[in-house]
Amino acid sequence: MGIKPSYIKSMGIALLEQHGKSFNGNFDDNKKVVAEITTIESKMIRNRVAGYVTRKVNTTPARR
């Protein structure tokens, strides 16, 4: 889907550092967690952050 904007990456990394145990490799589960943890009003931004977090969880060997 292309390169993510820096604000998506920084928000995703911050969420993983603070609430890493809450996330898993499932996008739908991560959407709900991002909605609960953050105050992001935009559905599109929330989904992009959840997608970035899901991708990080699935591709980072230590998180598997």
UniProtKB/Swiss-Prot annotation:
One of its GO terms (molecular function) is structural constituent of ribosome. The keyword Ribonucleoprotein applies. Keywords: Ribonucleoprotein, Ribosomal protein. It holds the Pfam family Ribosomal_S17e. SUPFAM superfamilies: Rps17e-like (SSF116820). GO terms for biological process: translation. One of its GO terms (cellular component) is ribosome. Belongs to the eukaryotic ribosomal protein eS17 family. This is Small ribosomal subunit protein eS17. The lineage of its organism: Archaea, Methanobacteriati, Methanobacteriota, Stenosarchaea group, Methanomicrobia. The gene is rps17e.
